[in-house]
Amino acid sequence: MRLVYADNNATTRVAPEVLEAMLPYLADEYFNPSSMYEPAQGPARAIAGARRTVARFFGGVRPDEIVFTSCATESNNAAIFGALRANRGRRHVVTTAVEHPAVLNVCRELEREGHEVTYLPVDSSGRLDTVAFVKALRPGETALVSIMHANNETGVIFPVAELARIAKETDPGIVFHTDATQSVTKLPIDLTGEFRHVDLLSFSGHKIHAPKGVGALFVRRGARWRPFLLGGHQEGGRRAGTENVAFIVGLARALELAASTHEEDERRIRLPSACRPRAA
């Protein structure tokens, strides 16, 4: 029996091109990229190249604004706890009631630690009320807004670019984070253009035909944020731990593939719906 897999929003198969790009760093180029000897410089250059690729994908942000992590859950934790560590005078967080558990459970932990969290409801269509969002913001008190870009259960797309703009116009001191795990490669995200008010963005590799066990966090230069995972100097001191070179290379290759096939993929996906008979 032939398996027809229709759950790519849960996880994806590693693309053959991604696996091919990864293999050298699992077999021959296995050196620690932090080491000073010559063989280790290859993996170090591979990470630097991957960082540039990811930066280009998001509209040409600075490569040093990309922090590689182990997954979107780590990225979300790093974004939220890091923003609050850098804004200790503010104790209020705004999020939605329909976030992924990687955000919701962090917010519940924040409440146990004494923070106040506003959970914005959605309507029967899963959409967010922008007016309620504006009312929830508290200038001088709100440290962080964390709102997903696309919901992992309903598929509803939240107007993150607009919400980030509103938050910054209300209070430039508010840090805006979005979990873009379900939207990266499916929707355009230009962090130098429409999404320029977003401070922190997280996503994962296994949703985009890269392997499980790798993700990234965009940290805009100048954003109020402090590192979450402490230890060594890796990732510019923003995420300690020896880098997973092969998986980082795979993540970047997956984004390259997505960028090169986006128009064709969108045409192919939209064609069946365009061909459906319409009611008179």
Task: Report the location of each language-model feature.
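Pyridoxal 5′-phosphate
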Residues: 1-280
